[in-house]
A protein has these predicted regions:
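Membrane-embedded helix boundary and interhelical linker motif in transport proteins
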Residues: 8, 30-77, 81, 86, ...
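Transmembrane alpha-helical segments in multi-pass inner-membrane proteins
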Residues: 17, 57-69, 194-271
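Alpha-helical transmembrane segments within multi-pass membrane transporters and channels
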Residues: 24, 57-101, 108, 244-245, ...
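Hydrophobic core segments of alpha-helical transmembrane domains in multi-pass membrane transport
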Residues: 46-51, 67-74, 99-109, 146-157, ...
Length: 293
């Protein structure tokens, strides 16, 4: 496998991290909280698609749409039941609640589906490409993942900058009190943010499980943590930062597996986080804020 192959597959992995990181960065940017249950919503999306496609025999696209609906409803429910009552609470209380929700989702999946890994059937039907006389192979999953990431980033940027709901999100992220005085329903805006983030988690789950087709109740844990690292690296609260952080993280992880050690790749990724926090605590594109996480 050539350097270019590792680079392209790293960009593909980074695109998945970027899509997941968007959920972290949107929720933090608007609600000023870290939803550490976000990675487990990815797992829920994966199991929803698995159930729809492999168990019920539905078409892959129908399974993906169903998973998006399931994850969206789940995300809004979590926000309403677990996080909204803690709106004025300390960051520590919110953090502990988020960790509790994460364990709850994992254990529910363990109870329903068991601990054995399920073989996930790829929902990608796009054929791969062979370039450079067949020396460079790009899988259909890689192509779809990169394209979907670009479309999501462009669409989400346009949505936030061009729509009333997006403008409301920007207003709430800047000053929640002033947004309330302007007549913006803050609770509804935050709920919409959770809905969008959870829908993106479902899409990320489909892409992740298609690329790495082993599904367990803990499938979303490590990708969720790495996506959080990507969000912090790029500047949590920044949509372009999520993309930059995700791509850099994916490429670094893939190249370190190829040329250094697959066992040390995670250590290298987290070392990168420590370095960026020491050099630039707000991340590459992050802005300094007054609140503490």
């Amino acid at each position: 496998m050539s350097f270019l192959s590792y680079l392209i597959s790293g960009i593909s992995l980074g695109s998945i991290y970027a899509i997941i990181a968007l959920g972290y960065t949107m929720v933090y940017g608007i609600a000023r909280m870290l939803n550490f249950a976000h990675g487990d919503i990815i797992m829920v999306g994966g199991f929803a698609i698995f159930t729809m496609v492999s168990t019920l025999g539905m078409a892959p696209m129908v399974g993906i749409l169903a998973a998006i609906v399931v994850c969206t409803v789940l995300g809004v429910t979590i926000e309403f039941v677990a996080y909204r009552p803690l709106r004025g609470a300390s960051s520590l209380a919110v953090l502990i609640t988020a960790i509790g929700v994460s364990y709850l989702l994992q254990n529910l999946a363990l109870l329903i589906f068991g601990s054995n890994a399920r073989q996930f059937t790829s929902v990608v039907t796009v054929p791969g490409l062979k370039l450079a006389g067949g020396r460079l192979s790009i899988s259909g999953e890689t192509i779809v993942t990169i394209v979907v990431c670009i479309v999501i980033m462009a669409g989400l940027t346009g949505f936030i900058n061009k729509t009333k709901v997006g403008q409301a999100m920007l207003a709430v992220s800047e000053d929640r009190g002033a947004a309330t005085l302007m007549g913006i329903n803050v609770n509804r805006t935050i709920a919409i943010t959770f809905a969008i983030g959870s829908a993106l988690a479902a899409i990320a789950g489909a892409l992740l499980c298609s690329t790495y087709p082993s599904l367990t109740p803990y499938t979303g844990s490590m990708p969720g943590i790495k996506a959080f690292v990507a969000a912090v690296f790029g500047g949590i609260g920044s949509i372009p930062g999520a993309l930059i952080g995700g791509i850099i993280l994916g490429v670094v992880e893939n190249l370190s597996k190829a040329y250094i050690s697959s066992q040390l790749s995670d250590a290298i990724v987290f070392s990168l986080l420590i370095i960026i926090l020491l050099v630039r605590p707000t991340g590459i594109l992050g802005k300094k804020i007054n609140e503490k996480v």
